[in-house]
Amino acid sequence: MLTFVGLGLWDVKDISVKGLEAVREADEVYVEYYTSKLLSSIEEMEEFFGKRVVELERSDLEENSFRLIERAKSKSVVLLVPGDPMVATTHSAIKLEAERKGVKTRIIHGASISTAVCGLTGLHNYRFGKSATVSWHRSQTPVNVIKANRSIDAHTLLFLDLHPEPMTIGHAVENLIAEDAQMKDLYAVGIARAGSGEEVVKCDRLENLKKIDFGKPLHVMVVLAKTLHFMEFECLREFADAPAELERLVA
């Protein structure tokens, strides 16, 4: 069997009890840090789980996933994934391939940044559109996604690139403005270290967010829709120090 276990948002202690049981009962345990990161080292995980943990590279998942699946034919194999296992399409593809080859699969979900941003900001989950990634290699894609979402009055969750190093909100804003200068006037929320207990959440225009020191990664951003529900505005004022002028978006 191949079991996908979500590790949650911050460190190894965010794993669920059910996930912990699966790890301790497994024959082999693997972890991947390509699609996301966790602030726990392999050594810390091994000490916590009392089990050897092998880190997989991107190629192990995308080009050579058949090797993992072959091992799961005769053994209980766990793949640890930061956040929730099925947010990344890579893991859905592995699950599909495994099932087609007769290998049973199981998913043990974990907390995801996709839902955590709603709790940290007060933004309504149903008002989010398509998400995008701001990468170190500049691309028009995030700007296009923001514009498309705003055309339907939806918020945009922006993941920030992790390779070769985690991107900061400041760098992400610079990339967006470099692609489209009009981005600087949009309101957004910057979120740092979700799930750590030491989160930083700030709301302002993009050009002002760039000047804020959010501290160490991991960082994400939400570019706001054209309008806000009055409760979203109240929450942003309270949770994210949003400027009073943001009230003009309430509809």
Curated annotation (Swiss-Prot):
Positions contributing to S-adenosyl-L-methionine binding: 9, 84, 87, 112-113, 160, 194, 219
InterPro entries: 4pyrrol_Mease, 4pyrrol_Methylase_sf, 4pyrrole_Mease_sub1, 4pyrrole_Mease_sub2, Dphthn_synthase
Catalytic activity: 2-[(3S)-amino-3-carboxypropyl]-L-histidyl-[translation elongation factor 2] + 3 S-adenosyl-L-methionine = diphthine-[translation elongation factor 2] + 3 S-adenosyl-L-homocysteine + 3 H(+)
Gene Ontology MF: a single term: diphthine synthase activity
E.C. number(s) listed in UniProt: 2.1.1.98
Function description: S-adenosyl-L-methionine-dependent methyltransferase that catalyzes the trimethylation of the amino group of the modified target histidine residue in translation elongation factor 2 (EF-2), to form an intermediate called diphthine. The three successive methylation reactions represent the second step of diphthamide biosynthesis.
Entry protein name: Diphthine synthase
Organism: Archaeoglobus fulgidus (strain ATCC 49558 / DSM 4304 / JCM 9628 / NBRC 100126 / VC-16)
Taxonomy of the source species: Archaea, Methanobacteriati, Methanobacteriota, Archaeoglobi, Archaeoglobales
Gene responsible for this protein: dphB
